Amino acid sequence: MIQEFIQGLHDFHFLQNALITAIVIGVVAGAVGCFIILRGMSLMGDAISHAVLPGVALSFILGINFFIGAITFGLLASIIITYIKGNSIIKSDTAIGITFSSFLALGIILISVAKSSTDLFHILFGNILAVQDLDMWISIGVGILVLLVISIFFKQLLLTSFDPLLAQAMGMKVNFYHYLLMILLTLVSVTAMQSVGTILIVAMLITPAATAYLYAKSLKTMILLSSALGAGASVLGLFIGYSFNVAAGSSIVLTSALIFLVSFFIAPKQRYLKRKVK
């Protein structure tokens, strides 16, 4: 099977596009996911990934690139959630739940109005084997941009993630870096739709980062390890999907989950097996 997969990479251009895109998404989602779980924003990641759905549907209706609509609605959802949380007694999880369900419902209504149901199905559940050249290059461009922003603002994102009160006392614009991270999260969510769809994007963000957290002792190490795990799971999941003719996006997610499960038992920081033995 491995030989057939390698031969397929040599013969089929669509598989080459899928492999490159999968690696890029795995690396970038793994990096951004580290900040998401450190801030306790896993639910926010899920909300943003689903909030882009009405933007995608509206883009199909209007005949424009789905990146435009998805990014617009993703950022809009982030702004609404932050505004509700900051201007009412409602807690963040409640604000996220209200916004998430509302945007999802709007997306479903727009899907029923849109004509291109096949393309929308791919957006919902992913079809990385159908990635075109333009989509691949957009993914690469977004990936480079996201990693560049993380590199430039690493110290600020680090401090605002671990101790926002201290960061604010030092004069840092905490809200600015919050929205900056939301922009990065939205960009990654839109890009990852091609591989796993809006339904499973949060798994690409959270699972590799959570696995890396079990091993890493510093944020830099965590980001590097999470990106490597994300890329590795993407390649292995693509191989499984192509070889066994199953959904590649779901295979990527399950591969990442399996790596986490193994790490849960053997990671030094977890020490689950040692505690059970004792």
UniProtKB/Swiss-Prot annotation:
A Pfam family assignment: ABC-3
Residue ranges crossing the lipid bilayer per the database entry: 18-38, 61-81, 94-114, 134-154, 174-194, 196-216, 222-242, 246-266
Domain of life: Bacteria
Topology relative to the membrane: Multi-pass membrane protein
Subcellular location, record wording: Cell membrane
Entry keyword Cell membrane: yes
Recorded family membership: Belongs to the ABC-3 integral membrane protein family.
UniProt function note: Part of the high-affinity ABC transporter complex ScaABC involved in manganese import. Probably responsible for the translocation of the substrate across the membrane. Essential for growth under Mn(2+)-limiting conditions.
Subunit structure and binding partners: The complex is composed of two ATP-binding proteins (ScaC), two transmembrane proteins (ScaB) and a solute-binding protein (ScaA).
Protein name stated in the entry: Manganese import system permease protein ScaB
Species whose genome carries this gene: Streptococcus gordonii
Gene that encodes it: scaB
